[in-house]
Amino acid sequence: VNRMLPLLGFLVVAALFGFGIYWTVQHNPREVPSPLIGKPAPAFSLPQLDQPARHVTRDQLLGKPYVLNVFGSWCAECVHEHPVLMAQAQRLGVPLIGYNYNDAPADATAWLARLGNPYAVVLADETGQTAIDFGVYGAPESFLIDAYGVIRYKHIGVLTPDVINDELLPAIAALPRGTP
């Protein structure tokens, strides 16, 4: 029996390891459902990146659906996503609004000047406070918000052409028509 204990211990560890791998494969952390889906977007008032004296509020954006894209000049994945946004922004059929997260405005402005600006407007959140209200884990993340200000879709990670074609565009097409 004493000689079986090491083997039994090994089998338990191997089983736990195997379960961990299985669970990780089955539960993609990018598919974490947001508790905000179907709920009004949090209230916010954020300065525009290019005109800090001008603030944009959630209520000013009511009446038209839009995609809110969270990015930062410090974000390596955002560099991969950016050419896709440059190429696909017009295809969305709704405004693409940039949400610059935890970033120095000068860095974000230089980043957009270098890579191009696909956004209708860019909001600046240097401290990341509003991001907490949106449940942002990091960048990039994207939200589809309908004309009534309700969050209809959230994507954690890079928006690829496949994600845009297979998820975001169908979500936009499914939005209720009309204005509030």
Task: Report the location of each language-model feature.
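Structural microenvironment flanking redox-active thiols in thiol-disulfide oxidoreductases
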Residues: 79-116, 126-132
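Hydrophobic beta-strand anchors of alpha/beta hydrolase catalytic cores
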Residues: 67-68, 96, 142
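Aromatic-flanked redox-active Cys/Sec active sites in thiol-based oxidoreductases
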Residues: 69-75
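N-terminal targeting signals for export/organelle localization
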Residues: 1-47, 180
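Thiol/disulfide oxidoreductase modules built on the thioredoxin-like
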Residues: 113-118, 125-176, 180
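Short gly/ser/thr-rich secondary-structure transition/capping motifs
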Residues: 26-28, 47-53, 122-125
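A short beta-strand-turn-helix
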Residues: 44-67
